[in-house]
Amino acid sequence: MNQTIGGIPMALLSAIFHVVICATVFAAEPVSRRPAEEEAIALLRHYIQIDTTNPPGNEIKAAQFFKEIFNREGIETKIIESAQGRANIYARLRSAGAKKAIVLLNHMDVVPADAKLWKEPPFSGVSKDGYIWGRGALDMKGPAIVELMSLISMKRQGVPLKADIIFLGTADEEAGGALGAGFLMEKHPELFEGVGLVLNEGGGIRLGGDGRARYYTVGVAEKTPLWLRLTATGAPGHGSTPRAELAVNKLVLALNRLIQYQTPVKVLPEVQKFYAAAAVLESGARRSQFADLQAALKDPLFAAEFLKEPRHSASVRNTVAITGIKGSNKVNVIPAQASANIDVRLLPGEDPTAFIDGLRKVIGDESIKVEVLLSFPPATSPPHAEAIRAITELARRHDGNIPVLAPLGRGFTDCHFFREKGVPCYGFIPMRGTDGGESLVHGIDERVSVENFQWAIRAMLEMVQKLVAE
């Protein structure tokens, strides 16, 4: 009997988490050691200048940008609109082979950016100090151009293919994907017939303090979002004469209880395996503690140190983040209603309804309404040994015998739409980043180094060729 975790055979999980696989030589040399990298820089700068802040999205402008490129390259393409101004771009490079197609997935929308806080205008796409600056440089306009260059490079050089390559740029990912990948999977499933693998954001190459690669990460599973809105009601009036039971006061008390609340620690088998595999990167006591994280967390001193690091804490517990508060729009008006948006991320296997019931008890005020804004079930990627092998060989070829690990994704991506249909969707774009670099995603002064971007273009092409070239 084959043992599985989250639907993935133990043998494959072992390969993912420990990855001590001997590299094999690629069947063919890479198409080009240096694709049109200067062209790619110009494309990325232009792409960043297309403001696709969601809301409202306006991805139609980005879709038209890509369509012009594909038309120029002679690649089959079409724009698929899901709502006014909301669009997805689909392009397909067809092969003569019978192998299942591969999708290069990315999203075209970006989160808002406050220009007053940035050193460079967030939609300038300026190239300065060795970086390309702008919202989306990392999430996910930079990776989209990396994927684009793989497709058009292989088309230009007439590489014989054993599988179709699909480029898919979606709308609305930053708001849950209902108008993007969700819409396409529901309304246009024919576009994905015969698809065997999807590559998306969610993994990459992690650097150490010395600038050298420490390990590669592949996204195979993610925490699931449970976005909530808490609403309190009370007597409205003039700010000069406050009454008891004000909506804002009730909301603040409830939010304070949430801030004080500590969700329980749960070490899932997938997480235990990830830290055990990552233990080789640690030294001293930390190595043995990571080797058996569940046991180590019973030590209060280690637990306090470990949970102090946000990315570690989020890997072993449900998280609750207050992300927005709304009351009156005038200083001297007491509102009848006050609300707060809450971003909850649940570990795989958690029941959203049960979690909300527990949250109500923490809040301790039955008059506060709890509304679900977004929720969907967790989905772990079905296995795809060939993709893992291609990523592992890429690591060995360029960075030696370093681990390839599968951490639990703390955010969510469009992958879940494909995983729910049984299609393997792996998070991996070969861009190099540090722990501190994560703060640039959705943060101030988002930027990608030109060197990193150009290397990713070469590495992505190398990996895609391994998967689809004859």
Regions found by a protein language model. Give the residues of each.
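An extended, acidic, His-containing surface patch that forms the Zn2+-binding/catalytic region
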Residues: 97-99, 204-207, 266-329, 336, ...
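Acidic/His- and Gly-rich active-site-bordering loop/insert found
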Residues: 29-135, 148, 154-163, 342
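A short core secondary-structure module
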Residues: 182-187, 235, 240-264
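Short amphipathic alpha-helices in soluble, non-transmembrane regions
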Residues: 245, 355-363
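Acidic/histidine-rich catalytic neighborhood of metal-dependent amide-processing enzymes
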Residues: 131-132, 138-217
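Bacterial N-terminal signal peptides
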Residues: 11-24
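Acidic/histidine-rich, surface-exposed loop or edge segments in extracytoplasmic proteins
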Residues: 42-52, 231-234, 366-374
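A common structural junction motif
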Residues: 108-109, 258-263, 360-368
